[in-house]
Amino acid sequence: LVLACCLGRAGVPCTVLEAATVAPPELRASTFHPPTLDLLDGFGLTAPLLAAGLKAPTWQVRLHETGEAAVFDLGLLADDTRHPYRLQCPQAELVRVAERLALSYPSVRVLRGARVHGLEQHDQSVTVKFDLNGQAQQLACALLVGADGGRSVVRGYVSERFDGETYPETTLLATT
């Protein structure tokens, strides 16, 4: 959606095919770091996130076994960033504000409930095959960007592997 904002601002036609029918409300990530806030600022996305979140002036690394903590004062970065703090704000809020901004551009459309099930590569274009509301659809485009995560459907169709790994879960996160 952030790429859709960038393309929309430039007037480039863009269609986002999103499998989820609604933005997921569950907490996936909750911290935006200074470089991310600086980047999102260029798209007009930081201000609404700041309004919805909580600024945290420090960053901590804690050894749970001993209770020891290293505390980093992010204010020391004030000469290097416009946002010398972390922002505690649910990722779902970024999805919400980015989708709203993307859809404000006439050249952008977001198709929720669109499940990609095939690709055809041509010399100068690619055709994406997907289902939308139970109906088979196709979309011809000059460029396809797969931004669908580690289990990427798009990556699978172009035979790109994900050589990353998943770390074991070692943290309990409680929100109120």
Where do the language-model regions lie?
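Conserved dinucleotide-binding and phosphotransfer motif residues
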Residues: 3, 10, 104-106
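Conserved structural-core and active-site-/substrate-pathway-adjacent residues in large, well-folded domains
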Residues: 4, 40, 95-98, 145, ...
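Glycine-rich FAD pyrophosphate-binding loop
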Residues: 5-28
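Residue-level detector of anion-binding/catalytic polar loops
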Residues: 13-15, 46, 108-109, 161
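Active-site-adjacent segment of FAD-dependent monooxygenases/related oxidoreductases
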Residues: 28, 33-104, 111, 120
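A conserved short coil-to-beta-strand element within the FAD-binding core of flavoproteins
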Residues: 112-126
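Core beta-strand elements of the Rossmann-like FAD/NAD(P) dinucleotide-binding domain
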Residues: 134-143, 147
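Flavin (primarily FAD) binding-site architecture
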Residues: 146-160
